[in-house]
């Protein structure tokens, strides 16, 4: 009967493990996948001995190496949630076995501790900056405890056999050689665990400390406690070896934060990732279905609209729109803003500022490594025609798993024996070359309006840059600058379509300057909009005109400028 109850109890416990694993996979696959995509894009793993040796620069090199190696597979659908779930399960299993090896009393104590640890790891993983290597560090700390415990058990059994074989035990055995060996093992294990698994050493220390407390009255326990405390203090001596502060020394590769699922941020990452993947229709659907999209969602939505030629038609679609043209990079600029601005300059055509923003985004990534930005640097130099620099970045990408195939194709496209497909890959970047900034890019400030003017002067048919320029003027309600830019750049295009937004803005300017009828006839080409303008003047501020620039001009607040 007792065995049957035990069997039923074990079945119930392991059923919880299975259900928990399924729940974890389902959540991260169907409700939280873009956090994992974001992590994959913000790291870089190269199959190169020179690169792999850089992991020795910080404690926990084995956990970081294994974590970054596995993180690169987050790029593939289903792979990320599977890897994360398995790593959490393995960590829970290691902790459970380690608690049992620590001989802590309680039949279900090991399972309870394992469940608590796995729940904590899932909660930590809700944060976008919690890396997989931190989970592996915990698993590694428990593994070191298990291995060292088994080695000590074997050593003690060996010493007992020697004592039984010897009728006159040696003096060393009489003094308790086993206790000294245990103390020495703990000291060595602390240093080894810290070297391999970083902050996983705290898991090892907690297991040793708890095991000692549960057997505090046994002989030799205080030797073990002393052997545990001393090396933790001696770890401070490795500060100069790793060139890091004490906090990093004891917490690397990172301690998690208890956060609830960041579903709003998940939508932001969804828009960011789908734009990166080229799924522009998904970007539009996500943003339009969101009740209150944040500034980053609006930013990518506008990028898509601008590339389709619909930016003026959708500028007033949100109460407070975000074009990104008022942002300036500085010490207080949010990390997400830094990582998105390169997309703006890429679309506008300014490769110099695109490269600058990309470099800064790379610097702001963990360990200054970002595979998405390395690929963008290769693309920038393809557009610029700097093939020597292009090859440098392509050689880096050739050593990755995800982008090696693309890098090989791009590398071959630069050669004389390029295939048709390889030439087509290069051609899409060559077609972007006429839109780059041909003006002197050395300037004292980062004025996006100046950049857009230079782009329009470099290529009068750069409609995207002109639309962004005019729309930025209108968001600021700077009618004088808008009129000047309209005359200088918009009217010089080959095909002028007289968008409704610009016509409405011109009516405000002409009415404000009391222009003559000849001026009205010169600029106002759409009589249907002019009739509605007369109606608005009779019902000024009426909600029925909320889709017009006239209403925005009267009611909306001017966006605050970033002056970093």
Language-model features and meaning:
Residues 249-434, 441, 457-478:
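Soluble catalytic regions of membrane-associated enzymes that act on cell-envelope
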Residues 19-28, 110-126, 132-148, 182-194:
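Membrane-embedded helix bundles of polyisoprenyl
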Residues 515-564:
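Terminal, low-structured helical/coil segments at or just beyond the last alpha-helical repeat
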Residues 1-24:
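Start-transfer (signal-anchor) and selected internal transmembrane alpha helices
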Residues 99-119, 158-159:
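Transmembrane-helix signature of polytopic, membrane-embedded enzymes
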Residues 26-85:
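Membrane-interface coil-to-helix junctions
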Residues 224-242, 257-260:
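Internal/C-terminal transmembrane anchor helices
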Residues 85-103, 119-120, 140-150:
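Transmembrane-helix motifs of polytopic, lipid-linked glycan transferases
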